[in-house]
């Protein structure tokens, strides 16, 4: 028995090779991120983090991402539930369409949104009604929502798929309506998945760049979210401000992933 234990615990060339590749990748990623964070001196980083431009970008990013994430979860919950529990004509096609933004480069999504709210019939009617979307703060929310709602739908759907439909059936036999069974049984059981999806969607909304750039533009202190701040400051050679915005985005991504690992057990992003 001891001999068998030693045989299984002794590293082989196979396992050593795979572990070496994994370690090399980990070291590379840590070195890249650490190099960015440690590049400016601490006083320079603090000064950049507290500059009026970066503070504006933080505030705008938090507000727009909160709104777009709220919209995502409001839409994603019923859509994900319908895709999980109901059968209807064209369900496969609907699934493809809902997930299409996941396969599109964000810049392509931005172009599509720009045309839709710009020269198209919809955009013309909206402008005639006094509603202008393009190059406004509203455009940031719209772009974040369009790109990220498929992620929320997929994560929420994954959470619903782990729940046995029998629980809802039992609740109905005990007198619950469909809505009551959903609210009292399904939603509580899906809470962890919903929290994980909310956090990841919020993080991705804050980090959205391509679609936001094309639909909302890149105007300093107007439509300047954190990713736009990185873009603008790199373009003008203000490296410290770009790094400051990047550090904030890295921190948000790190916290979001930790929360997802905590609450997203068994939940898929893609």
Task: Give residue spans per PLM region.
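Glycine-rich helix-loop "coupling/hinge" segments at transmembrane-helix boundaries
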Residues: 211-237
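Short, charged juxtamembrane terminal tails flanking transmembrane helices
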Residues: 2, 263-270
């Amino acid at each position: 028995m001891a001999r068998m234990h030693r045989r299984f615990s002794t590293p082989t060339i196979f396992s050593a090779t795979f572990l070496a590749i994994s370690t090399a990748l980990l070291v590379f990623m840590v070195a890249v991120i650490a190099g960015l964070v440690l590049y400016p001196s601490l006083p320079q980083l603090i000064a950049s983090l507290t500059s009026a431009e970066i503070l504006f970008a933080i505030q705008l990013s938090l507000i727009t991402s909160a709104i777009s994430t709220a919209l995502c979860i409001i839409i994603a919950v019923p859509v994900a539930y319908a895709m999980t529990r109901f059968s209807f004509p064209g369900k496969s096609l609907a699934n493809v369409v809902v997930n299409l933004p996941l396969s599109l480069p964000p810049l392509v999504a931005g172009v599509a949104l720009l045309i839709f709210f710009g020269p198209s019939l919809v955009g013309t009617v909206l402008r005639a009604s006094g509603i202008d979307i393009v190059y406004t703060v509203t455009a940031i929310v719209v772009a974040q929502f369009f790109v990220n709602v498929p992620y929320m739908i997929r994560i929420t759907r994954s959470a619903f798929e782990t729940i046995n439909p029998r629980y809802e059936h039992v609740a109905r036999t005990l007198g619950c309506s469909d809505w009551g069974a959903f609210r009292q049984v399904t939603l509580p059981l899906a809470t962890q998945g919903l929290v994980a999806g909310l956090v990841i969607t919020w993080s991705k909304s804050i980090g959205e760049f391509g679609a936001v750039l094309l639909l909302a533009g890149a105007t300093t202190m107007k439509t300047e979210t954190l990713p736009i701040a990185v873009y603008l400051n790199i373009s003008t050679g203000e490296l410290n401000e770009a790094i400051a915005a990047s550090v904030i985005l890295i921190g948000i991504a790190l916290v979001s992933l930790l929360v997802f690992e905590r609450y997203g057990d068994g939940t898929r992003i893609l």
